[in-house]
């Protein structure tokens, strides 16, 4: 089957829904695609299309980050529906790391919950630059004053995590009521109060979330999110291009986790359409020649040859989450071995030493809420570089978040 070409007419942005479990992220994603489909901008996706993996349907929660595409009057969006269940924050980290902006979904009936706060913190740590809030389930709240109190609480929470809480737009609506209106046969879709709230939300996203300046000048790099094998054609690696650009026919290196290996790009696709060239910000599938499926895995990066090296040993500045932020309840010591989440990989690391952030004195014990410097040795080499952000997790909790300051050469 011949695929059509991807036409680059409108600016492309990566956006996502974040927030607490059952606050309505996936329902809102479905409502957005349905509302924009009415205007002829996209194909409608229902809730079950987005909530696609079998274990998601069985438990009614989103596990893998799900990608959909849609357009507004002025932009083309790739939308990632981020998981809300505590066990699956690692996928949320992968999804958030790909976002140019986020829609924070908060139930008007419940207000901000522990995962709401954790997702805001993670969004800040992985560099999501702008957030718009959708205050959902407004149809379940009769008291306007209660919704105003929830708005204030959301603003305070955002400000706590260094987002401009008082400036961030908050759109109040009901994703499920809008979705029901959009799927009903005899309801006027345009002009419906709840559907209009979805259009208001997307107009706000268009206006408030800035079009990012893509980092196309630096050497190409893409963290691999998934790998599939196509019989007779080769191996496809999918992910978001972090920086640079790449064309069919060019050579790339596979870096991290295993021995570094070269491959030739024989095809590029985005949303089932072919590309000759892919640039920073694109969510692409890259067809690779000379690579077997077992030689490549999620967590590796594809990069311009010799532009990035695998390392195991680094120093970093780290913030250790408080108990109220979903972090540890107790202190820990040198020798602690949590998981380090970097781009799309997670690998166990041995924390060798701690130092105070300000005075550089050696510390024996670290408490929740501390800001420290630490030296880490990973059990496997991965593609890391200075100024790169990461999260630290243990037993289903985000323990800390940090940034690499120094690579320690072996």
Curated annotation (Swiss-Prot):
Residues 136-139 are annotated as: G4. Residues 19-26 are annotated as: G1. The keyword Protein biosynthesis applies. The keyword Transport does not apply. GO terms for molecular function: GTP binding; GTPase activity; translation elongation factor activity. It comes from the Eukaryota. CDD domains: EF_Tu, EFTU_II, EFTU_III. It is found in: Plastid, Chloroplast. Residues 81-84 are annotated as: G3. GTP binds at residues 19-26, 81-85, 136-139. Belongs to the TRAFAC class translation factor GTPase superfamily. Classic translation factor GTPase family. EF-Tu/EF-1A subfamily. This is Elongation factor Tu, chloroplastic. It comes from Codium fragile. The lineage of its organism: Eukaryota, Viridiplantae, Chlorophyta, Ulvophyceae, TCBD clade. The gene is tufA.
């Amino acid at each position: 089957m011949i695929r059509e070409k991807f036409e680059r007419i409108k600016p492309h942005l990566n956006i996502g829904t974040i927030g607490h479990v059952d606050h309505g992220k996936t329902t809102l994603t479905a409502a957005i695609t349905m509302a924009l489909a009415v205007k002829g901008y996209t194909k409608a996706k229902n809730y079950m299309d987005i909530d696609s993996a079998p274990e998601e349907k069985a438990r009614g929660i989103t596990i893998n980050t799900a990608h959909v595409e849609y357009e507004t009057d002025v932009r083309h969006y790739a939308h990632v529906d981020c998981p809300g269940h505590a066990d699956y924050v690692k996928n949320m980290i992968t999804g958030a790391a790909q976002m140019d902006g986020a829609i924070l979904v908060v139930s008007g009936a419940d207000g901000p919950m522990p995962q709401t706060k954790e997702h805001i913190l993670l969004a800040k740590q992985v560099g999501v630059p702008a957030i718009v809030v959708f205050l959902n389930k407004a149809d379940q709240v009769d008291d306007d004053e209660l919704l105003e109190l929830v708005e204030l609480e959301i603003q305070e929470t955002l400000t706590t995590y260094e987002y401009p809480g008082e400036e961030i737009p908050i759109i109040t609506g009901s994703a499920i009521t809008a979705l029901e209106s959009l799927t009903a046969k005899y309801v006027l879709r345009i002009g419906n109060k709840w559907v209009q709230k979805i259009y208001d939300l997307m107009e706000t996203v268009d206006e408030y979330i800035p079009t990012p300046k893509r980092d196309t000048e630096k050497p190409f790099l893409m963290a691999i999110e998934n790998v599939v094998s196509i019989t007779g054609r080769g191996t496809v690696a999918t992910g978001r291009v972090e920086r640079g650009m790449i064309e069919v026919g060019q050579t790339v290196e596979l870096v991290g986790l295993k021995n570094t290996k070269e491959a030739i790009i024989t095809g590029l696709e985005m949303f089932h359409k072919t590309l000759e060239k892919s640039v920073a910000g694109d969510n692409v599938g890259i067809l690779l020649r000379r690579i077997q499926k077992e030689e490549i895995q999620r967590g590796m990066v594809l990069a311009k040859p010799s532009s990035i090296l695998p390392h195991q040993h680094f120093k970093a500045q780290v913030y250790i989450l408080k108990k109220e932020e979903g972090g540890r309840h107790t202190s820990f010591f040198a020798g602690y071995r949590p998981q380090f989440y970097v781009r799309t990989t997670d690998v166990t690391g041995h924390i060798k030493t701690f130092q105070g952030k300000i005075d550089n004195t050696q510390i024996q014990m670290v408490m929740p809420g501390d800001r420290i410097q630490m030296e880490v040795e990973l059990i496997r080499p991965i593609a890391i570089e200075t100024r790169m952000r990461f999260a630290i997790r243990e037993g289903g909790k985000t323990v800390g978040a940090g940034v690499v300051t120094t690579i320690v050469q072996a």
